[in-house]
Amino acid sequence: MSTPKDRPVGSTPKDRPIGLIALLPYLREHLGTLVVVGALSLLGAGASLAQPLLTRSVLDRVSDGLGVSRLVAVLVALVLLGAAIGGLRNYLLQRTAEGLVLGTRRRLAGHLLRLPIAEYDRRRTGDLLSRVGSDTTLLRAVVTSGLFETVTGAVMVLGAGTAMVLLDPLLFGVTLLGVGLGLGFAATFARRVRALARAAQERVGEMTSAVERSISAARTIRASRAEARETETVAGSAREAYGAGLRVARVQAVVGPIGSVTVQGAFLLVLGIGGARVAAGAITVGDLVAFVMYLFFLALPLAQVLNAYTQLQSGLGALQRIEEILAVPAEGADDRPVAATATAIPRRPIPMIEFDRVGFGYPGGESVLHEVSFAVPAGTRTALVGPSGAGKSTLLALVERFYEVSAGAVRLDGSDVRDLPRDALRARLGYVEQEAPVLAGTLRENLLITTPDATEDRLRDVLDEVNLGHLALRSPQGLDVQVGEGGVLLSGGERQRLAIARALLAGPPVLLLDEPTSNLDSRNEAALRRAIDAVAVRRTLLIVAHRLATVVDADQIVVLDGGRVVAVGTHAELTATDPLYRELATHQLLVG
């Protein structure tokens, strides 16, 4: 991948501008091609710079009545050679730019999927998407119309300037004075582009977030008759992006005309003064024509350099946003070293999961768990119940190491989960979220997320385990039937059971279920309960439950309130001894 591999994380603060040096790691993989492009650029520049001298020779020989056929043939050959070199160079440059964008997108997407969960909590999805999409696209212009146009233009300017000095130092001085003043003024404006371009990309990210939010909640918006309000919200974000883009365009619009006026003014000066010098016999007509040709070879690259500079600044602004994400340490970057004895999870006949005086607070927030201690014996079913905000789902997240405990320890088979490699830990855990995501695509694709090499028979078996075998039978497409965006073609109960099937496919001995029956009707809830009963025989289950009816037969129930354990026992024991549990059960008509 054409992306940095050894850049230290956290090395690109958001507000610190980055320079061209930041591009080098991205271009390292394409170094060979870029060397070829550079060589072709030099050859093309040489072919172009030779043309005015040949033109002067043709004109001088015509004035002297001499033959010019051979010189004209060489001139035509140089023009054709320059065109061929330019075409090949541009193709290689575009291919390199596309490779750079591809490599950056792969790197960025892979890094996004490995960010700590806390980063997803605090960042907007749409903004992250815009960094993968629009920001990486701007890098293409950095390589093509930015970096290499600047280099090629500089070569042409140097060559043309040298030739102009040799032809007529006086005319070159006149040219330099006019062009230099104009370019200095234009460069002053061009320096503002990077900050403006970064601000424009930020506004695009906000607009993408607004669109993503509206589309993901399309049914709610439609049912609430809020289309007009949401449209205005998106339109407001779009107007801000439009305004930010206009600010960039205004600066670029100033730079372009300044370059044009500079070239035209220099051309008129050279014609006037040069014509007078031809009349005075100081130079020949051929010298003047060659000088004018070099003037355009000087002016056009200068204009390209100015345009390339603005493109480069826009691209560096986008690169800064990309680097900002890549500088965020991936999950596990700050893990404590894993002991050699902890590379495999031990399997001892002690409590499968143990919470030992666990304390936890979300980053930047207050503590949500306090001195939580209880054990989940191997092969049993334990339920976590309590009011909203009691910390039930947080406990599951700590087992999965989505977050790390602030105090105490979570242990699996006696080992602190922080001492275990995350992949090895999660291979032993099946996790089903409260809002179980079903990905757009087919039934098969959703199942294979956890175990991509699972056989057809294994897929059908796991569907049967959760009473979903009918999904593969009700369509001629079988397991390749489409489930729709977010599983919209499935019922709520089918989505939840599909998530459980996905978790079961890898055969984990521990299953973590976060309110699996939330928002289900009684029929789907009963089907899901049967599925849970079927898979509980061979596993340890830790279930967060809002509906107590789904866990009344659990081996133990842990009651949480305010981030603390207030009671542990069976349904019968807690109904008799714990006021909070009895209140919850009474509200759900489980006790009189």
List each language-model region with its residue ranges.
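An intracellular "coupling" helix at the cytosolic face of ABC transporter transmembrane type-1 domains
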Residues: I117-A118, S134-V143, L147, V151, ...
